[in-house]
Amino acid sequence: MSNNPHRTHKRQKSSVSNPGYYFTPETKSEIQQQQPQQQESQQQQQQQQQQHSQTHNIYDNDNYMNYNFPPTSNRPRASTTTGTTSTTHPGSELSHESHSVHTSPLKRTASSELDQPIPAMAPSSPLVSSAPYYYQQPSQQQNLSYHDHHHQQQQQQSTPQGQQLSQQTQSNSQSGVPPPLYGTSSSIPPGSTMQPSTSFAFHTSHSTYNPSFDSSNLYNSAFRLPEYPTTSSSSLLSTTGGKQFQQSSALLPSGTLPPSILGTSSSSHVSALRQHQKNNLSISSHLTLFSLSGNNSSQLQSQGSSFQQSETGVDDTKRSSKESTTIFNDLLFHLTSVDGSNINTFLLSILRKINSPFTLDDFYNLLYNDRQRTLLDNSNYQNRIDKTIVSPSDTDMTVSIINQLLNFFKTPSMLVDYFPNMEDKDNKLANINYHELLRTFLAIKILHDILIQLPISEDDDPQNYTIPRLSIYKTYYIICQKLIASYPSASNTRNEQQKLILGQSKLGKLIKLVYPNLLIKRLGSRGESKYNYLGVMWNANIVQEEIKQLCDEHELNDLNEIFNSDNNNPFASIAPSGSATTGSTPRRGLSHKRTSSKQKIKTEPVAGNPFLQPLQTSHHHHHSHHHHHEEQSQEESLSQQMGEHITAPRLSFLRANSKYPTDVNLSVLDDDNWFVRLSYECYARQPALNRDLIQQIFLKNEFLLNNSSLLQNLMDSIIKPLVMQETYSNVDLVLYLAILLEILPYLLLVKSSTNINLLKNLRLNLLHLINNFNNELKKLDSPKFPIERSTIFLVLVKKLINLNDLLITFIKLINRDNCKTTMSSDIENFLKINSQTVKLDDDDNSFFFNLNTTSMGEVNFNFKNEILSNDLIYTLIGYNFDPTTNSELKSSISMNFINEEINVIDEFFKNDLLNFLSTDFHAGLDDDNGEEDDDEEAGPGSTHPMGATGSQGSLSPEPVSTGNPSVPPTRNTSISEVNAENKRGNEAVLTPKETAKLNSLISLIDKRLLSSQFKSKYPILMYNNCISYILNDILKHIFLKQQQQQLQSSSSQLHDTQPLTQQDTAQGIGSSSSNANNTNSSFGNWWVFNSFIQEYMSLIGELVGLHDNLV
């Protein structure tokens, strides 16, 4: 055995690399007084290190950890006696102690990408260090650091001098001297060669092939550390008075170092790797318990009871919080240099540095379902996909570290808080796609755990342990599908979750990353050979027979068809298998029950709406099992029949087969209506909701003075408490429905207490809510309030505001006699009778098309046949729906059925609407006042344009309205008086006469267009679209007829041969202009009316759909 000269430094070694610095054969007083004796003792210790380093193996030495400080920076006595020569750094509580992290020689060779140093740190980082070397290649350098403290402790304790040194260690630790971060070796019998099991679980096994850290770099300018005394974090309060440490750590999370420390001396974090337990056969263990070569079998067998005792001690001891902090700080230090080019390497380093058993089930739920806690803490062992047994302490530590690291990727600006010297431009985390990071992290974890790379010796043939390359991807694909089916996401559908599966090319790159030295060879007969990985085997805890059978018997295309088909999916009903044991909270229980999971999967191809699939949980705890099963079977049968020809909108709560309730009163005007009962049901379903608080936030004018008041109160008083409380499932939907039901009567103006100021402030606050609500939810980042659902809620809020605009505009318009007259005339002339088309000359090219050739320009036009019948037939054909059988349209439908269906709609437009326009609603006023009011509103000075109540949410009352029914307004009312009256804000938005008209219109729609005849036969989507077709065709028909009248009038004026005087000409032009204005006003009235009906029916349908998602 050669004795290579040990490389030495010119500067004195610190306590880490020089154990004789603190402990010499002399007494404590002699240490402080005799410097020559210290140097002699240090030389002796260095010789022992040289001799020891040549006879043992060293693995996984973290280069940047092994900083060796000069003696003057760590001498406890010198720091207290020579205060003028040493300075205390504010963030110096981090103990810079060097460790060589060792692993078993049976451990497989790790990623070569990890061997390469992570790219250079950002320029703002105070220290630049090389990447940690967990797995080294052969080198001839020797390690100067103190790498085998356990062995030396045993040598010291075996002699009286060693016992004295051990006593000095305890005395020094009490006096503020940082003790080495090693576990005690008292459990190891004297003379045993087995390495002790420490608090860091360093199972040391040395090798002469392990490279050492080139300590000559320690004193380069890039690695130089400030010379100030360092103390351990536990003793900082006593040495510094506690002021600086308390100030720096006041805002820090538990278990992390202060940013000031990480910004100045972050290169000294200690890496603490830990081997897996005996029962864990994931790839991180790498067969540490056996070897095919048998090189170390005799050593393991010779340990006997000592080995068992050591292993038991590791199993029973929880990993200390100090170790968790060390690992996190180590990873956090490397996070500063992470960008898109090395993110995969960093993710792999997280798993290897934590090096603790953590099941795929917990890992998947940590990434996609619940980052605050483990979802499977109470689940049955047999129901897990990964059967690896783990300890709760290891799981908690892993969850804590990964959660903290993921927060940096979600909020990259947090990194600057931990590293104050780092500039924003050097922070590359913002350029990393978070979704891509999560699915890549999951893929690395799966690859890391499903395979075991065997350490093949020269006598073993690696071809005895082979796995086809395609089988690895198919196994990865199957496991992802199994995780998706077993643990449905609360915010995404199964189709959305499919996006987390990587393609073959990217997974192949990750295989090379995780297993860089894995041998690959084409095996098989000529023409049928396939690429196989050599020297690997499956982890039986994860890859079980069921997965192997699917992988061996099916090609990749067949697997895609199997998992995309609900009938053939072998894991479609896996999720509820452990539901009985996972119901520690109501939310967990409802999200993992068999019926709800199956229903999600069964109805997904029907609805085609990715936002609604998580909402379709069966409300089984309110119904009997038999009734629920029967109802579900009927719904699934109807869904299967309609699934191919009806698709729900993406931003909608409606399902494909949602229908209006038939046995309830849908009119908002009645006291005991469906909306009132639904509101009570919402608060009964979620007791955590406070109705008085919601009404106070939304409907009290004093809480709506600022545009942001509603949003701030909603977040602080309602949503944030709901996030912290234990609530039932779909709490967000219940809250949204309760809010819509509370503000619905106010925006529809059916509440008599609605005044101008309240409506104006409410609209402004709702507009602010629409623009900023999703941003607040993103900051909250709670699975209880997914963005997909809140987006649909905001669409409904915007629909309510638009409905309020249309409603006010239409009521104000039809309150004028000329508007009522023109609309009534349109019905009499164009809809009620068989209108005759005026024949124009063929050479008349004054219009953009010939009106005689249009379908609505026929001589004998029939509104019932040409519009109503055709639109209903087009709707049934377009949706491929037969209302007589409530199924797919397979045969023709008789015209008698069509005529019977449209009779109600025909009666609505020809008679009901005409009576509504012709009836005067005076609301208790005498006729004179009503006529004067109408005349006044028809005047040119009191017009009410549509833009007065536009999307900006600004409302203004009628300029001439005084709000007093008994006092009619006058034309001579000054503007100042009107403005002064409006400022009082106590006037109602509508006059009593207008309110009566509004109530009549809403009642007409509820009872005629939403009659039971249509509600029982047609889905909401189909019926609402049919009404929209009819309204649009009516609008087009009226427009064409009005254009015909204008053309006829202009043609008659051109053919008039009588001479016109100048006065007659002016009168003719004025008359023509007046007719044109009337025509335009009539068309505008019809447009507002049509838009109001469509928005109103759409809103009612959405409320029904939202309710259906809760039952």
Swiss-Prot record:
Disordered as annotated region, ranges: 1-199, 300-320, 570-642, 925-988, 1050-1076
Keyword Transcription belongs to the record: yes
InterPro entries reported for this sequence: DNA-bd_RFX, Mediator/Homeobox_domain, WH-like_DNA-bd_sf, WH_DNA-bd_sf
Bias-annotated ranges (Polar residues): 69-78, 183-196, 570-585, 949-979, 1055-1070
DNA-binding region range list: 450-540
Extent of Low complexity compositional bias: 32-68, 79-88, 129-142, 153-175, 300-310
Skewed-composition ranges (Basic residues): 1-13, 589-600, 618-628
Domain of life: Eukaryota
Principal subcellular localisation of the protein: nucleus
Induction: Expression is negatively regulated by NRG1, and by the contact with host oral epithelial cells. Up-regulated during the yeast-to-hypha transition through the function of YAK1. Also regulated by SWI4, SWI6, and WOR1, a transcriptional regulator of white-opaque switching.
BP term (GO), one: adhesion of symbiont to host
Record carries keyword Cytoplasm: no
Gene disruption: observed consequences: Leads to increased resistance to UV-killing, derepression of various stress-related genes, hyperfilamentous growth, and overexpression of hypha-specific genes.
GO cellular component: NELF complex
Biased composition (Acidic residues): 926-938
Alphabetically ordered keywords of this record: DNA damage, DNA-binding, Nucleus, Repressor, Transcription, Transcription regulation, Virulence
Molecular function, one GO term: DNA-binding transcription repressor activity
Signal sequence interval, chain numbering: none
Gene3D superfamilies: Winged helix-like DNA-binding domain superfamily/Winged helix DNA-binding domain
Subcellular location field: Nucleus
SUPFAM superfamilies according to UniProt: Winged helix' DNA-binding domain (SSF46785)
Family: Belongs to the RFX family.
Purpose: Transcriptional repressor which regulates DNA damage responses, morphogenesis, and virulence. Involved in the regulation of filamentous growth through its repression of hyphal-specific genes such as HWP1, ALS3, HYR1, ECE1, and CEK1.
Protein name, per record: RFX-like DNA-binding protein RFX2
The organism's taxonomic lineage, starting at the top: Eukaryota, Fungi, Dikarya, Ascomycota, Saccharomycotina
Record gene name: RFX2
